[in-house]
Each structure stands twice: as structure tokens, then as C-alpha cells.
């Protein structure tokens, strides 16, 4: 006898585990209930929420012994009994599940609320779900889904051929997300796998020496191997930009940041889980750390990398006209100094996966944003041919740029190959935050002027970016920012320079916007200040200076069509006028009554080049029709929650001329899909979508030519037969698919097409055509400031984003809301401090209670280069958020906070300094 007995999803169970074992581990490991997700093991994220005697609890905080004699219900139990069917349908209908990693926790918490309250208020939903974090959705769709779960949901849209594009269909991969059946990196680890733990530097900067590994192994039964830099068979370096690849898999003699990998141990899971890293044989000689560019870039600073004096990784530069002369003649000039800190991506899924050696090949499974890039990098590290590597992506529980870089992959690849055993790894939350890339901290100074009418006259920008210990995406940030720092405005006299500097901080990499959100803070605050000097409406100032078709950008590029910023600003006009009037009236009344509260309204604009900056940026799509009538789309653009699987399928279906739901999707696997490039830089809808358009059209043409019918004939797939109806003549043709020969891919008809956007290199002054397409947007925030406490409450966000063509309006809104939420974090709370904020309770991200009401205006100014006129969106949407908030705070209480985040203590101190605080 013995063990712990309880009811699990309505069945009596007894488990022999140690009573101190986490309930979450018992559910996942003992019963295979992987719908219970592990995001933090600290009760911070809520992804592991289950019901204990019908009350929601974090299963990671409960020892299994604590549930003895009680009833535990997991997401699987709720799903299998149909108890949450209406709630799941509502989540799908509202687009409330993006990456899906938080969805089980949200559903369990919502189910508890709805059990006793079928029609909760917004406040009640926010309270019930306040313990579950989401980094993708911005929460608003989740709130709507819970509030409407009682209602009869409309039937899912099933558009006909030719009507796929523009339809707000549900995520094609949504059902397994709301059923908690989608497998993420930690959900399919082989039962026989050894576990790997990375030994990481506890110091920001230190030399080290590893001791006797053989003696260590002899003293630690259950640990079967130790790996370090001497074990790398190929090149001990990786990076997303090959000429700058400088990050070792294992540091060799010097660790350059806290959290850098120096070794790895591999063994049986129980031993690895319980290992005390103080027992690892390593000695350290710390150096004085250089954590900021001002320290690291001095002439006498210790050089971190050969060939990079003063620790400068790269500089960026764009100039046109004569900025100094224009500033000298300007009627008004303003200067702005802004700073932003490290920002953690804080995806709810920590890095996890495994590798296995199979038929003399390496197979790597786990979460990534760039499967083909991972494959190529692992091949170089392992000294193997790329054809010997297969990357099989799991579902990705959030990425936002950080999962573009390698993380766990080289460790498990090396160990699995050397040991000829499956090897798995699951990062703890702290390990994920210590070791992963961050948004670049910025230190920006700019001066901008205007003439008496308000037209911009001279713009000088200087940005210093902390790129951390290794290059990662530092070159991209340094080169992209000077192209964008003007904002989407006519700026004929312009000079912008940037520099990325190495420090002993975590590598700064890609994070939604590649530095542009940082530069937008200074740029948009400056335009508000100029408008004030002119006595001009702030929206009107932006409208006067907005780029139009056939006007040159700061790189000299002119677009004949598709420049949509003026349309976005015009779309905001009615809401702006009404908000300005409301704010003015409220503040007058507050002044009369002595209230501590003041309201403000702020506006900011954005533009963003879709894809790589002046570099090749190809994407390849394959489509094939099998003899059984199944049409397969080989879609390698990684869907990390943004909806690539759905949007690209909609484009391909319309190009072929079939309903989107008739397509079968193969996504991500490097053995099965062509290279669609990385999921970053708002490129997938535009670049991969265009490749899908070309592939669909090519497949259609092949079929029509085979049947000898006109180009406008309709295609109807009926199992093993194609029926084609010539629209011009009404004639019908039938193709018996089963009678046709198949190719090497197993298809009777197949197409494969590549699209690479037309760009040109930039010259020494940054002149050229860096992007084929830009997206545009503007946002307006209404907020309330407590002058006594300095606290900010966001009331309403109105957005106007030009997407060219809304391939899927539901997904467009989801991307906007998720981006705005991350912009709120940048503006008001997020600040990653190495060694201090390495968890999700010290590092704050927006919760469900921090999100304002939303109103969206989708602007469609088609671009001839995009598929059906579409542009990218994902990066753009957080760019204007922080500056709009900062501008609104200033309008509300008269203080300009540009050293972000604008926390309550900073606002209160600024108010007290100017004598306008309120006790």
C-alpha cells in the first residue's frame, strides 16, 4: 500500500511518486496530460492551471501529496466531457488563441468562472483570468470570448473559391490549441531520452577553467557525459548573420555574460534534475563587467572580440540633403534624449526539445522561428552536410524574435550524436531569461526643426544600442534604425547614425521591430514638442508632414503606390477630435473639483519596411495535387501564433481557385517544406504570401493547360477527379487523377515558386531601396494619470493600420492587440536587469487588467508588390504604442518621461520636481 490517491478527471488514481513531487510533473509525466503547460514553476504565469475540487490552482505550486483525497480536473478532463465546448467555440470564433501556450490555463480559469456566472462582466472576467499571463493576444479577444461564451456562436466561415482572401476565417490550426492537443517543445520528449543540463556562467565577465571531467563522472553515477568546447566537431560559433557569427556553443576560456554556456552534463532525468551545480568542477576568475556602452566603448576598455576596437560591432548611417543647414534656418527646433532598457521577450513557453540520431542523420525537434536557419547552423557546428540534419519544429509557444537564434538545439544535437541516444532538454524560466536574447537598450539623441508653417526642416539623429556580448541581430538593428528614424514623414534634410556596442550583458537580438520602437519614442515625442511650439494640433502636424506616393523617403526611394500613412492619420481624425474634446472637458472639471486625476490623449505614427534590409530575402512555396484528390501546401513559414498557416493558405487557395478548407497543410519540417525564410521582420504575409500566390497560380495554370480550358475556368476537386468548368463557354472537362503518373513528391500536378522582393544595396550615405514594401500605422491612446501616485490607467486605444489588403481581418486585429500590449510593457513597466529580474514576478509584463478598450480601423492601401496588395503587419503594431502613451502622459500632466519605462515613481518624481504633484 502507499502512494497518493485522488480523483483525476473523474477517475480514481493512485500514484507512487514522492508526495513532494509537483502536481504538474505528475500530470504531465505520470499521466501524459501535457495540456497542463509549464511556463515558470513559480505560479507566475498560470499556464499550469487546473481545478482542485472545482477551484483553479497553479499545479506547479502544489505537491501531489497536497491533493490526496481531492478531485483534480485538467484541461483534458474539461475537453473530453464537453464541459467547455461552447467556450472553446467562442475562443475560436474570436481568435482568442494565437500561439496557444496560455490557452489551457485561460480555458480552465474561464470554465470555473462560467460555472457559476454564465454572463460575466468585463471586470469579472479580468478578475477570474488575472492569474494567467499571455504574451501574444493582448487579452482583449480572450475577454470577448469568455463574455460571449454563453451565446450561440456563428458557424465558422467556409468561403468559396475566390473568396478566401478577405475572409475572417478562424485559425486553421486553432482546434488543437483550444483542445490542448497541440504539442510544444516539452510535450513529446522520448520516454527513453537522457536529459541535458547546461552549466552556465554565474558571472557577467570571467575567465574559467574546467577541472577533471573523468573524476567528476566517476563521482556522479547517473551522469553519463560532460561536454564542453573541446567536443565540438565542427565550428564552435553560430550567429544569424554569417559574417558576424561569433557566439560559441560553449565558451572556451572566457564567459562574456551571465548565463553563457560553458559546459553541459547529460544523464538520467532524476539525477540531472537533482544535480547541484556547485558540484561541477570549474574555477572562475571574474573581471570587472562592462554592462553599458559608455563603459565598454572607451579606448582603454577590454576588447571583447578581435577586430572590434572599442567594442563597436557595427555602425549604421543614412543621410540626405543638408541637415545642419536646414536646422540652422528652421523657425523652431527641439531636442529629445530618450533611453530604453533591455526588454525580455517573456514568451510563456521556455525553450525545450530533443535530438535523436537516426539512420546516420540528426533529427532535432523543438520550438523555433527559423527551421532552415537552425538546420544550416547545426550542420556547421557539427561539421556535417545539411542533408544530414532534419529540423522538425514543434508548436511554438511564442517567439517574438528570440527564437530566431539557436538556443537548446546545438546542445542536444551534440549529445545525441556523440552518445547515440535521444537527448532532451527543458529550460527553466530563469535559465531562459538569463540566456536568451533581449530587445536592444537604446540611448538616443535627436534634434529636429520645422518652418513657420510646420514642415520639417532638418533632422539629426544619433542612436547608441547595447548589443550585448555577441552580435546576434545587432547589425540588423544598427542598419534598420537610421532608415526608419524619421518616421513616415517628408524629411528632405536628414542625418541619422547608429552604433551597436558590445557589453557584458546578454546578447541583444531580434524583438518585434528591430530597434524601430526605440527610435520612435524620440521621434514622435519631438514632433509633439514642435507642434506645441507652433500652437498646432498634434495630429494636424503629422498630417502636414506625412509621406505621399511619389515622395522620396530618407533613402531616396519613391513608391508610386501603397504609401498609406496619410490614410491612417485621416482615419483617426474623428476619434481624435472627440477624444481631445473629452479630455479637455474632464480636466476642466478636475481642476474645479481638485481631483488628483488628469486625462490625456496621445498620438504616434509608424512605418516599417517588410523583410530584410537591402539583402536577399527569398521564400519558396510548393503545392501539389495527389492522385486521391488531396491538394497539399508545403508551407515552411513558421507559424508562431501570428497566423501564417492560415493567411498563407488563404492566399494560395485563391490563387489556385479552390476553397481554403480543401487544402492540406505541411508546415515547417525541413525534410518536407522548401525554405520560406525566417519568421521575422513582418515578412511572411508579404514574402511567403507572394511565393504562395505564385505557386498557386502556377499549379492552376498547369491544371488548366492539361485540360485545355480557358484561364478563367473553375476548378472543383471531387476525390480522385477534377471537374473544370469553362466560364466562357460553359464546357466541362474532367480529369481522372488516379490515371495520371506521379512525380518524386507523389503528386500528379505540382508547382514550386520562389519570390525575392526587389531591393537594392544602400550606398555610403544610406541611399537606395532597402525594402520593396513598407507598412504604415497610427495609434491614439486615451489615458488617466493619478497626480498623487504617478499611476497611469489606459482607457482606450484607437488604431489605424494600413495592411494593404486584410487577408484575414480577424487575425489582423489579433496582431494589433498583441503588439499594443507589448508596446504598453515597453512604455510603462518592462525593464530587464541581468541577475535581478530573471523571473515573471520581478520582471513585469502587462496582465489582463492593464489592457485598454480597443477600437480598430483597418486601412487598406494596396501595394502592387504584395500578394493581393497585402503588406506585413506584425512588427509595425507596437512601434507607435509607447510614444503615443508618453505623449498622452505629457498632455495629461505636463511631464515628458523619455527614460522608459515611465513608471509611477518616475512620473511622481517629475511632477514633484515641477511643483505639480498632488499629495
Model-derived regions: residue spans:
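Flexible, low-hydrophobicity surface segments
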Residues: 150-312
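Glycine-rich loop/linker segments at domain edges
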Residues: 95, 167, 173-179, 309-353, ...
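Thiamine diphosphate
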Residues: 395-420, 424-425, 644-652
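Signature of N-terminal electron-transfer/Fe-S-associated modules in redox systems
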Residues: 1-160, 179
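C-terminal catalytic domains of large/alpha subunits in multi-subunit enzymes
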Residues: 229-230, 383-388, 418-423, 452, ...
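Helix-loop-helix junctions that connect adjacent transmembrane helices in secondary transporters/permeases
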Residues: 301-382, 547-630, 839-857
Amino acid at each position: 500500500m502507499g502512494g497518493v490517491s485522488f480523483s483525476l478527471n473523474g477517475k480514481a488514481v493512485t500514484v507512487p511518486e514522492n508526495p513532494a513531487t509537483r502536481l504538474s510533473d505528475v500530470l504531465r509525466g505520470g499521466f501524459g496530460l501535457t495540456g497542463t503547460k509549464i511556463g515558470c514553476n513559480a505560479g507566475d504565469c498560470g499556464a499550469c492551471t487546473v481545478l482542485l475540487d472545482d477551484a483553479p490552482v497553479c499545479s506547479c505550486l502544489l505537491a501531489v501529496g497536497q491533493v490526496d483525497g481531492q478531485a483534480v480536473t485538467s484541461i483534458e478532463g474539461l475537453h473530453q466531457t464537453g464541459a467547455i465546448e461552447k467556450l472553446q467555440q467562442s475562443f475560436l470564433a474570436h481568435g482568442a488563441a494565437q500561439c496557444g501556450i496560455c490557452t489551457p490555463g485561460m480555458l480552465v480559469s474561464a470554465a470555473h468562472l462560467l460555472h457559476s456566472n454564465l454572463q460575466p462582466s468585463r471586470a469579472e472576467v479580468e478578475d477570474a483570468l488575472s492569474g494567467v499571463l499571455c504574451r501574444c493576444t493582448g487579452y482583449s479577444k480572450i475577454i470577448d470570448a469568455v463574455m460571449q461564451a454563453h451565446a450561440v456562436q456563428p458557424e465558422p466561415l467556409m468561403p468559396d473559391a475566390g473568396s478566401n482572401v478577405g475572409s475572417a476565417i478562424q485559425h486553421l490550426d486553432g482546434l488543437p490549441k483550444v483542445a490542448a492537443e497541440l504539442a510544444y517543445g516539452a510535450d513529446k520528449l522520448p520516454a527513453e531520452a537522457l536529459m541535458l543540463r547546461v552549466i552556465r556562467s554565474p558571472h557577467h565577465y570571467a575567465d574559467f577553467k574546467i577541472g577533471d571531467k573523468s573524476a567528476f563522472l566517476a563521482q556522479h553515477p547517473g551522469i553519463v557525459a560532460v561536454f564542453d568546447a573541446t567536443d565540438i566537431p565542427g565550428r564552435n560559433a553560430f550567429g544569424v548573420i554569417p559574417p558576424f557569427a561569433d557566439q560559441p556553443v560553449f565558451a572556451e576560456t572566457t564567459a562574456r555574460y551571465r548565463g553563457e554556456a560553458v559546459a553541459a552534463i547529460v544523464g538520467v532525468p532524476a539525477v540531472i534534475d537533482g544535480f547541484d551545480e556547485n558540484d561541477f568542477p570549474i574555477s572562475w576568475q571574474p573581471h570587472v563587467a562592462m554592462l553599458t556602452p559608455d563603459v565598454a566603448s572607451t579606448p582603454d576598455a577590454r576588447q571583447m572580440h578581435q577586430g572590434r576596437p572599442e567594442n563597436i560591432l557595427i555602425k549604421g548611417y543614412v543621410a540626405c540633403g543638408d541637415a545642419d543647414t536646414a536646422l540652422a534656418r528652421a523657425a523652431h527646433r527641439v531636442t529629445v534624449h530618450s533611453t530604453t532598457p533591455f526588454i525580455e521577450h517573456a514568451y510563456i513557453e521556455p525553450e525545450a526539445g530533443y535530438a535523436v540520431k537516426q539512420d546516420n542523420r540528426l533529427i532535432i525537434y523543438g520550438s523555433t522561428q527559423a527551421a532552415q536557419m537552425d538546420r544550416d547552423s547545426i550542420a556547421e557546428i557539427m561539421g556535417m552536410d545539411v542533408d544530414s540534419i532534419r529540423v522538425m519544429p514543434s508548436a511554438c509557444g511564442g517567439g517574438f524574435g528570440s527564437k530566431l537564434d539557436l538556443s537548446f538545439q546545438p546542445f542536444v544535437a551534440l549529445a545525441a550524436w556523440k552518445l547515440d541516444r535521444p537527448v532532451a532538454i527543458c529550460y527553466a524560466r530563469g535559465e531562459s531569461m538569463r540566456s536568451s536574447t533581449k530587445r536592444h537598450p537604446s540611448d538616443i539623441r535627436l534634434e529636429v526643426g520645422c518652418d513657420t508653417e510646420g514642415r520639417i526642416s532638418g533632422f539629426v539623429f544619433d542612436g547608441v544600442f547595447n548589443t550585448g556580448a555577441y552580435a546576434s541581430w545587432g547589425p540588423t538593428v544598427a542598419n534598420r534604425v537610421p532608415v526608419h528614424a524619421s518616421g513616415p514623414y517628408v524629411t528632405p534634410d536628414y542625418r541619422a547614425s547608429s552604433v551597436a556596442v558590445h557589453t557584458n550583458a546578454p546578447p541583444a537580438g531580434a524583438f518585434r521591430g528591430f530597434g524601430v520602437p526605440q527610435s520612435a519614442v524620440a521621434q514622435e515625442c519631438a514632433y509633439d514638442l514642435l507642434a506645441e511650439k507652433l500652437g498646432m494640433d498634434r495630429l494636424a502636424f503629422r498630417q502636414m508632414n506625412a509621406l505621399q506616393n511619389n515622395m522620396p523617403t530618407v533613402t531616396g526611394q519613391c513608391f508610386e503606390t501603397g504609401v498609406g500613412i496619410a490614410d491612417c492619420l485621416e482615419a483617426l481624425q474623428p476619434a481624435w477630435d472627440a477624444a481631445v474634446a473629452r479630455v479637455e472637458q474632464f480636466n476642466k472639471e478636475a481642476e474645479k473639483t481638485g481631483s488628483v486625476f488628469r486625462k490625456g490623449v496621445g498620438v504616434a505614427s509608424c512605418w516599417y519596411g517588410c523583410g530584410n534590409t537591402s539583402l536577399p530575402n527569398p521564400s519558396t512555396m510548393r503545392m501539389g495535387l495527389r492522385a486521391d484528390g488531396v491538394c497539399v501546401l508545403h508551407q515552411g513559414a513558421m507559424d508562431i501564433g501570428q497566423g501564417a498557416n492560415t493567411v498563407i493558405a488563404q492566399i494560395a487557395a485563391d490563387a489556385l481557385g479552390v476553397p481554403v478548407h480543401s487544402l492540406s497543410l505541411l508546415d515547417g519540417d525541413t525534410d518536407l517544406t522548401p525554405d520560406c525564410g525566417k519568421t521575422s521582420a513582418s515578412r511572411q504575409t508579404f514574402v511567403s504570401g507572394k511565393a504562395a500566390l505564385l505557386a498557386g497560380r502556377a499549379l492552376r495554370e498547369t491544371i488548366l493547360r492539361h485540360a485545355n480550358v480557358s484561364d478563367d475556368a473553375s476548378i472543383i476537386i471531387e476525390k480522385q477527379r477534377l471537374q473544370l468548368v469553362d466560364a466562357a463557354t460553359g464546357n466541362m472537362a474532367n480529369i481522372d487523377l488516379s490515371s495520371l503518373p506521379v512525380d518524386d513528391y507523389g503528386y500528379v500536378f505540382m508547382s514550386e515558386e520562389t519570390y525575392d522582393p526587389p531591393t537594392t544595396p544602400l550606398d555610403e550615405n544610406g541611399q537606395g531601396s532597402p525594402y520593396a514594401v513598407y507598412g504604415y500605422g497610427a495609434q491614439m491612446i486615451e489615458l488617466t494619470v493619478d497626480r498623487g501616485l504617478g499611476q497611469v490607467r489606459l482607457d482606450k486605444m484607437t488604431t489605424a493600420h494600413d495592411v494593404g489588403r486584410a487577408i484575414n481581418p480577424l487575425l489582423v486585429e489579433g496582431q494589433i492587440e498583441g503588439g499594443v500590449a507589448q508596446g504598453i510593457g515597453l512604455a510603462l513597466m518592462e525593464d530587464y536587469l541581468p541577475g535581478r529580474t530573471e523571473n515573471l514576478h520581478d520582471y513585469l509584463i502587462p496582465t489582463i487588467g492593464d489592457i485598454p478598450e480597443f477600437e480598430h480601423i483597418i486601412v487598406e492601401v494596396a501595394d502592387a508588390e504584395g500578394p493581393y496588395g497585402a503588406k506585413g503587419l506584425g512588427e509595425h503594431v507596437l512601434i507607435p504604442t509607447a510614444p503615443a502613451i508618453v505623449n498622452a502622459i505629457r498632455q495629461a500632466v505636463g511631464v515628458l518621461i523619455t527614460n522608459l519605462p515611465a513608471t509611477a515613481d518616475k512620473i511622481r518624481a517629475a511632477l514633484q520636481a515641477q511643483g505639480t504633484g498632488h499629495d
